[in-house]
């Protein structure tokens, strides 16, 4: 019966049936909205989520459909961030505000064009987010959305599956997370001459593109909430065997403020007015750990099996040289393609597959062709 309902519902609104995938149920969020009259709805992703796009459209849909419900909406979108950063900032930006009833997430585009993640990295990030949600807020109903950029759209048009989408899909299938394949729907509608890339608005959609996305979500939720009202909330499945043993399920930030400073390092606001490159407002007026002196080491200990840093990498970004436990050596060039004219936020990982336990790390700045500046907003621990 459900299959028939899905087909007729999707045919009615003209969407390709495989592009709106309902997995599991949305009974828990419905109970919070209809029975309790109070619900928390969080949106996580990059600039597509942060901007006034599909997110406020869905907020408006929920508020109008349920005027008696007191909604708390969380905008956890941060431009340029990928699923790796998402896994480490989830406790701060979302879970710190208490249980979440409905959670929307998108990282397909940024895992592709910003982070250029491998399949393993895409899985570590997305699975880490889903497992954290399932462990700390087990009744949360989740929807993932695949937005699209020109390269990914061309891949779909040629019958290929973009790497970030196929990687995320493995996670969504395993944890029975519902999915909106906006990218594939757009490709299909363009082929039918119902839409154009220009009308959609590009990687950061214009109102028509965001309306298409919001409509798909509204239809999914309307379908999920169409039966008799449930009375008992149930936790979602939480498999004990993850896809990746190195996923960031225990991802969290460690403030550099807790690190003992050594010569050459400061925990303060950089001298932004005298630094070349664009600066985003959210990162100003806040202290961070920084140095522009090469070969000045700083040391600290951490508990976990992964260590990295959430940094601002500008035109003068250098290279971090590191040593873990006195035996694992490496270096990471902080400079990114987007760093040429912007102090660009990105997460770099030093190690993700250590043995669980206490470790020590030493880091220092090594000059690169662009400069030798290191600016760390948070350390990333898993």
Which residues are covered by each model-predicted region?
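Alpha-helical cap/lid subdomain in secreted, periplasmic
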Residues: 56-72, 81, 85-234, 254, ...
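C-terminal interaction-tip segments
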Residues: 381-382
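Surface beta-strand/loop "capping" patches
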Residues: 231-304
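Membrane/wall-proximal cationic-aromatic binding patches
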Residues: 15-43, 48, 62
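Surface-exposed aromatic
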Residues: 75
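Bacterial N-terminal signal peptides
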Residues: 1-11
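Catalytic nucleophile-elbow at a beta strand-turn-alpha helix junction centered on a G-D-S/GDSL motif
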Residues: 38-53, 78-82, 306, 315
């Amino acid at each position: 019966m459900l299959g028939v309902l899905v087909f007729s519902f999707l045919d009615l609104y003209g969407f390709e049936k495989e592009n709106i995938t309902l997995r599991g149920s949305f009974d828990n969020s419905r109970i919070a909205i209809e029975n309790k009259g109070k619900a928390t709805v969080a949106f996580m992703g990059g600039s597509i989520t942060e901007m006034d796009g599909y997110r406020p459209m869905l907020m408006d849909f929920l508020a109008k459909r349920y005027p008696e419900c007191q909604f708390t909406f969380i905008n956890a979108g941060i431009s340029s961030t990928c699923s790796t950063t998402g896994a480490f900032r989830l406790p701060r930006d979302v879970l710190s505000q208490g249980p979440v009833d409905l959670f929307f997430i998108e990282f397909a585009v940024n895992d592709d064009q910003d982070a250029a993640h491998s399949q393993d990295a895409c899985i570590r990030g997305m699975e880490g987010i889903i497992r954290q949600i399932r462990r700390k807020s087990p009744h949360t109903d989740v929807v993932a959305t695949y937005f699209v950029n020109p390269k990914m759209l061309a891949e779909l048009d040629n019958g290929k599956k973009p790497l970030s989408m196929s990687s995320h899909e493995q996670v969504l299938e395993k944890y029975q997370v519902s999915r909106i394949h906006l990218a594939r729907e757009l490709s299909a509608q363009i082929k039918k001459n119902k839409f154009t890339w220009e009308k959609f608005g590009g990687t950061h959609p214009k109102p028509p593109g965001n309306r298409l996305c919001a409509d798909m979500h509204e239809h999914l939720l309307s379908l999920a909430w169409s039966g008799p009202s449930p009375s008992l909330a149930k936790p979602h499945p939480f498999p004990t065997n993850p896809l990746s043993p190195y996923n960031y399920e225990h991802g969290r930030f460690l403030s550099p403020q807790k690190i003992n400073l050594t010569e050459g390092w400061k925990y303060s606001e950089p001298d932004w007015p005298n630094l070349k490159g664009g600066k985003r407002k959210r990162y100003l007026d806040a202290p961070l750990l920084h140095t522009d002196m090469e070969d000045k080491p700083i040391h600290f200990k951490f508990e976990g099996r992964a260590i990295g840093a959430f940094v601002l990498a500008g035109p003068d970004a250098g290279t971090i040289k590191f040593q873990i436990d006195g035996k694992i050596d490496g270096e990471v060039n902080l400079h990114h393609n987007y760093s040429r004219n912007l102090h660009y936020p990105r997460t770099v990982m030093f190690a993700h597959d250590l043995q669980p336990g206490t470790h020590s790390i030493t880091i220092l700045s090594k000059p690169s062709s662009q400069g030798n500046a290191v600016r760390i907003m948070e350390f990333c621990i898993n």
